[in-house]
Amino acid sequence: MTPWELAKPGTEHAHQRALFAWAANAALFGFNFAWEEAAYDHRTREHVAQRIWANPVPKLTRLFAVHNQGHGDRIRGARAKAEGVKPGVPDIMLPVAQRGIDVMTCSGLFIELKRPKAVKRQGIASDKQFEWLAYLNDEGYIAVVCYGWEHAAKTIQNYMERKLTR
């Protein structure tokens, strides 16, 4: 399935699955392939692979989700809190530092993923989420809100290509 097909239900979870599918292709074959592959179904994979020279981005294999969603009933919520779950922590982290003469020093990228406006009602970040984003930015990370998997994928690509600034 393409990332667009994975995101079709319109939920934040669906968009997160789509983002990780896109990132897996980018890690193996590069950003150009990941965007082309996202546009086609898997029956055309050989055709796409022939058209685009692979330029893998292996550091994208370090992209991970922070399981910090609602935990159902009070007992599970209390257990999650005891295990260190914090409300408002961003959904996704890419622990890849960016350093260089012409680029700011940055410790990694955090993304709070929300539904895009085109799907239902656009997701809204909570006050706790904005507090975490501000804290992480102050600590030397780039921490942003992205609306939909495409916005998040473009943000990740810009970060990896050193085009993203705080």
Give the label of every model feature segment:
Residues M1-R166:
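Catalytic phosphate/metal-binding cores of nucleic-acid and nucleotide-processing enzymes, i.e., regions
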